[in-house]
Every structure is written in structure tokens, then in C-alpha cells.
Regions:
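Rossmann-like dinucleotide-binding domain for NAD(H)/NADP(H)
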Residues: 95, 225, 232-314
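N-terminal glycine-/charge-rich "phosphate-binding" loop or analogous flexible N-terminal tail
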Residues: 1-44, 48, 168, 172
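Rossmann-like adenosine-cofactor binding region
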Residues: 53-55, 177-270
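Glycine-rich NAD(P)-binding loop of Rossmann-like domains
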Residues: 123-159
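Phosphate-coordination loops involved in phosphoryl transfer and adenosine-cofactor binding
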Residues: 4, 64, 144-147, 225
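Phosphate/diphosphate ligand-binding glycine-rich loop within oxidoreductases
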Residues: 43-124
């Protein structure tokens, strides 16, 4: 079934065997490394999140036709370059129905929220690192007595709202698509959500060109002492205002799975949020692991392979 369409897998470690078989049926499959030099032979690039596909990188691939990314976000791809070169990008945005049963990011969001409220990581560190056994070190609350606001009621937001609703929490949501209805949570205005939420969970979809969702205006009206959780994108929030609000106590805790891209990989330690954590503020940061489970990754890699196959009508 070969169509002589050669594929380069940028991050081949533990990649789905089924997906690799599909790409091999179309042509030669290459695995990327620092010594790779077959750029001119590549028609398809398959990526995760480890590399930023900018103009300099993509210019090395004159025959490139498709980029396949097993992600919902495309912030790791220079969208202007691919538009100018008419390169087709296939991502999980193209198979939302297929990924509706994937819960890995929702699970992480729930875990980060509970950790932020109950201070589990901080308590664990006090025992394991400091050797102290002090159950009175932090004042925490029961989630069932709190108001939870979900900003963005898509796949992740809906799952999160359902779980916390079953805890007995008062769950409200705002979505920019005002036609969304849900039995899982009460629909309110964005202002009402910001003003009343004890815990505000950011789950919006976001792409290049969209406005910031948590900016100066939003930080001015959020509830005093709110706990903020972000497993969406770093770009949805004004980090300068976030840091300022944490220092002032307006935001009493922040848990996130994302940082601005310039701080990812080896630069994370220089971000102001890390410094706030070191100063004792309630900060939790994970290195973009929302979808980083073996079963979810294998499934989504196969989804992209099927999309590529369909694109070439094979």
C-alpha cells in the first residue's frame, strides 16, 4: 500500500507500534535525532510537544506536506509558516469524538485541585524532607463546602464539573459558547463566576490569536483568596498579574500544568512562580503531563495515524 510518503517521527521513544506500521505502509519511517540529515525526503512530520516547529526548523523540509500532532493545542507550531507554505496540520482537533473518552488531563486537573485545597504535597514534603509530623501545619477546607467555577465546559471542563458535583460542591461554569447547556453545573456570567468561586479552574480551548482569558480586568474582580487551577494553556493567563495577585494574597494558591514556552524544558526554574514556591507560597507546577499517560498517548498517536492515512485516501 506504499504511496512513497516518507514520515519523520520527531519524538520516537515509546511511540505506538500500530502507528509506526501505518506510516511504514506509506513509505519510509525515519526517527529524528541531532544527526538527522534526510530532510529533503520527508513528506510527513509527526510531533508531540518536545520541539518548537518554527520557520528555521520547517525550512529544512522542502517536501513537507503534513504535520501530525497528537495534541489539541498547536502552540508548538508556527501557524503562519504552515499557512504560507500550505502545509496541512492534523491534530486531535480533527477527531474530538474519538478522544471524548480520554480522561488523563481531566484526572490531572482534579488531582491538582484537590492537592491545592488539601495541601497534600506540602504535607508530604514536611514529613519526607523535613521529618516533621505536624497535621496542624496548614488550614485546609472540605471541597464539598466550596464554590467551584469551571471556565470552559468542553471535554475536560465537563468531566471536572461532574466529579466535583458528585463531591457535593456548588459547581458553576462559564463558556464563551453561550449555547452550551449542562445538567452538571449552573451556567453563570463570567463576572459572576469570577466573583463567587472559591476555586477557579481554567479549562478553555485556546489557539494563537485568541485573547487572554485571565487578564487585568479578571484579576481585579476575582474573589479574595481564590485558588486557581490551569491545565489549559499558559497563554490564557497574564502571568505578571498572576504573580502580583499571589504576592498580595488575592490568589491564595495556584496549580498549573503549563508555563510559557520559553520557560519549558531547562528554563522552568527561572520562572517567578518557582521563586514564589521557594518562598513558601501555595504553588504546584507539573511539566505539562496532562496527556502524558501511556494509554492516552498510544490512543491519540493512532488517531493521528488514521487521519494521515485518510488524508491520502489510503
Amino acid at each position: 500500500m506504499s504511496s512513497n510518503k516518507n514520515t519523520l517521527i520527531l519524538e520516537p521513544q515509546d511511540y505506538s507500534n500500530r502507528s509506526i506500521s501505518i506510516y511504514k505502509s506509506m513509505g519510509t519511517v525515519f526517527e529524528y535525532n541531532k544527526d538527522f540529515n534526510n530532510h529533503k525526503e520527508i513528506h510527513i512530520i509527526i510531533c508531540r510537544l518536545g520541539l518548537f516547529l518554527d520557520m528555521e526548523f520547517l525550512s529544512k523540509f522542502p517536501s513537507l506536506e503534513i504535520i501530525g500532532s497528537s495534541t489539541t493545542s498547536l502552540t508548538h507550531i508556527d501557524e503562519k509558516v504552515i499557512q504560507d507554505r500550505h502545509i496541512r496540520v492534523l491534530s486531535l482537533r480533527d477527531c474530538f469524538e474519538k478522544i471524548s473518552n480520554i480522561t488523563s488531563t481531566s484526572e490531572l486537573t482534579i488531582g491538582l485541585t484537590i492537592d491545592l485545597v488539601r495541601r497534600m504535597s506540602a504535607y508530604s514534603n514536611s514529613v519526607l524532607k523535613d521529618g516533621t509530623w505536624n497535621r496542624d501545619q496548614f488550614k485546609t477546607r472540605q471541597i464539598s463546602s466550596m464554590n467551584i467555577g469551571v471556565l470552559g465546559l468542553g471535554r475536560v471542563g465537563s468531566f471536572v464539573a461532574e466529579v466535583f458535583g458528585k463531591f457535593g460542591a456548588n459547581v458553576s461554569f462559564f463558556d464563551c459558547n453561550d449555547s452550551i447547556e449542562s445538567h452538571l453545573a449552573k451556567s453563570v456570567s463570567k463576572n459572576a463566576l469570577l466573583e463567587t468561586s472559591d476555586i477557579l479552574i481554567l479549562c478553555p480551548s485556546w489557539k494563537h490569536g485568541n485573547p487572554i482569558i485571565m487578564g487585568n480586568r479578571e484579576f481585579n474582580i476575582i474573589k479574595e483568596g481564590v485558588l486557581l487551577v490551569n491545565t489549559s494553556r499558559a497563554e490564557v493567563i497574564d502571568h505578571d498579574r498572576l504573580v502580583e495577585s499571589i504576592k498580595l494574597g488575592k490568589v491564595s494558591g495556584y496549580a498549573t500544568d503549563v508555563l510559557p514556552i520559553k520557560y519549558e524544558n531547562d528554563n522552568a526554574g527561572s520562572h517567578e512562580l518557582v521563586k514564589l514556591y521557594e518562598d513558601g507560597f501555595n504553588i504546584i507546577i507539573t511539566p505539562h503531563i496532562g496527556g502524558r499517560t501511556t494509554d492516552a498517548m498510544s490512543y491519540t498517536e493512532d488517531c493521528i495515524a488514521d487521519l494521515v492515512l485518510s488524508h491520502y485516501n489510503l
